Amino acid sequence: HVISEKPVTLSLNELDSVIKVADECGKLFTVHQNRRFDVDYLMMKQVYASGVLGDVFGVESRYQGSRGIPGDWRGHKEHGGGMLYDWGIHLIDQMLGIVYDRKIESIFCRLEHITNDEVDDGFKLDLYFEGGLDARIEVGTSHFISLPRFYMTGRRGTAEVNDWRDRTRIVTCREWHEDDVKPVVTSAGLTKTMAPRDEKTVDESWLDRPESDGHDFYRNFTRAMDGKEPQLVSHEQMRRDLEIIEAAFESDKQGRIIPFDDCHFGK
């Protein structure tokens, strides 16, 4: 039985060949998707599934730092370097775990080369889901001020995790109509459109951080070895993540949106 380091392989064809051998030998093969146990991710997954925000139309997931790529394999293309392989594979897997009930229609990706010409040291990846939901996955290594770790918007509210160590802030709309909107005064004039809402029309709440144990990944794998439960990260899920990685590279290469023939990820 084998647990591979992420991203698992550097191509879908290579992954398929490994899966074929594993099946022929009757052995388990999976990838170490330890970020499925990140608490910030688990909170946003809970918010989406609860429906508290109404029909969700936007999800943003980011990791940003300011130290560039570490001076090891991550800087070399032949060894699977670059942030899309290193962090992208985790954040893609998380996004598909959050938006579990929609198909991807197309994707667009732009890679960044701020400090490294050989591999990407950052990227912006947009996943366009059916029903008008747009998801942005972004990683940067030259950012000295970070944007929120997670940001989710729906027709009835917004949820935010500012930092991976924080709780989730949720603001929902209690009453859409306001009788008297107080305009914001700027140096260039007044605006009511972007004026903050009256506290009487919104509710604010906080979702506490749940308990999580990354060792559950290994506990699952040992039980799967004994035939007691299916492995947590399935072959289908590994293929799906890598399909998106390959499509992202192709999108950046061609400079255009790539249509994506998709299937449901599975809740």
Where do the PLM segments sit?
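Aromatic/hydrophobic pocket-lining residues that form π-stacking "cages" and hydrophobic walls in ligand
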Residues: D16-V18, M44, A247-A248
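C-terminal glycine/acidic-rich active-site capping loop/insertion
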Residues: R156-L232, E236, I258, H264-K267
